[in-house]
Amino acid sequence: MSSLYVKLGILAAGLMLSGCMQSTTFEATNQTVFKPRDKELLAKVSYVKTPVPEAFRRAIVDYHRKEAPGSIVVDSDNHYLYLVQDGGKAIRYGITVGEEAMAWSGIAKIGSMTEWPPWHPTPGEISRLGVPKFVAPGPDNPMGSRALYLYSGGKDTLFRIHGTNQPEYIGASISSGCIRMTNEDVIDLYNRVKMGTIVVVLEPKHGDSPFNSQMALQGGGNSIQ
């Protein structure tokens, strides 16, 4: 029985570190966010539209960190991305985390935004995955329906938040890639943010460490219009 209490305590601590408490309101996708091209291409996907586990469905949750409303916060450890709202709330999205996502942390800004982006694989990806140097935009492109390109100090960090053609991995860590969201969720996020939005990428495996807490104080954010 004592081991059960220990497990429950660990779970509660994880929820605290991920910035959410018990209040959770799941959000259905508003179909008005989809443009005609979105509807056309999403209808053509060849991958299986695996339902996202309930824990990683888009939801409005209580949020207790200090980032300003309008900021994006990426919590790689818990596979969540938060869009901070007013009133101690945030929109929480489930994400897939890859090695590239675990390799960078800090504060960035959205420096570019693209609908249905092409994919330019890195030399390592070309060698490892056997993919071409260029993959055109489309329903089965690994970049998915939207991409947010993160910049720091005026330079591209090579860190992206984008859609996916593998929604079955939402809530998981995989061998490569940046931050992936379902195509529907990344469209929703894309429509809520703008160029210059602050993105705080928490240091993996450190939870609410002094480093991450200091980033929270530095993160500015932009109010959602």
Locations of the language-model features?
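N-terminal pre-domains immediately preceding structured catalytic cores
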Residues: 2-8, 14-225
